Amino acid sequence: MNGFTRRTKEKMETIEEATISLLDLGIDNIKIADIAAKAMVSQVSIYNYYGSKDKVIKAAFERLMNNQIQCLEKLIETDMPFKEKLEQLLTFKKQTINHLNIYKYSSQDTQFIQFLSSLYSKSSPLFIRFIQMGKKSGDIRENVSDTTLMFYFDMIVQSLTHLPIPHTSAVN
């Protein structure tokens, strides 16, 4: 990789990480100027690399979801007891849900929908493996099918994604 390509890649990673840190503001409240300031790049660089605010947000969301899949894989492979893993998984899911308002934002983007579908394809086997670990440890009854557990888990996640998510604010 030549120097220009490497610097471009590093700058894009910085922009996407800065955007990820701003996702809690809500997509409508994120401004290119805020991303540029946080990433310490010019707004022009962002437009040159991505073309629009929508595209930088989608790229950042894709980076975030890929990072979270990796974290999920690491969590499942740890030696901690199943119940602790479950608690961390639920916390992980709650944090992820906060970023899922991008669904409504990009529901017309077929490439993004394909990306979300591929994420589901990656995470489903992880969840099945997690279920199997729970059965092996005796924390999940053997007679409950993986399909049933996946159905309920998906139903819970779907219901959470359709709930309005309040922005965190200081309470006096």
Show which residues each predicted segment covers.
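Short hydrophobic/aromatic patch on the recognition helix
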Residues: 39-50
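Short amphipathic alpha-helical segment with a characteristic S/N-K-E followed by hydrophobic residues
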Residues: 15, 52-58, 67
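Short secondary-structure transition hinges
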Residues: 94-128
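Short, basic, alpha-helical segments at the C-terminal edge of helix-turn-helix-like DNA-binding modules
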Residues: 32, 62-69
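Basic, helix-initiating cap at the start of DNA-binding domains
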Residues: 1-25, 29-38
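The DNA-contacting recognition helix of HTH DNA-binding domains
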Residues: 12, 43-44, 54
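Hydrophobic alpha-helical connector segments
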Residues: 59, 70-98, 150-153
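Hydrophobic/aromatic-rich alpha-helical bundle segments in the mid-to-C-terminal region
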Residues: 105, 135-172
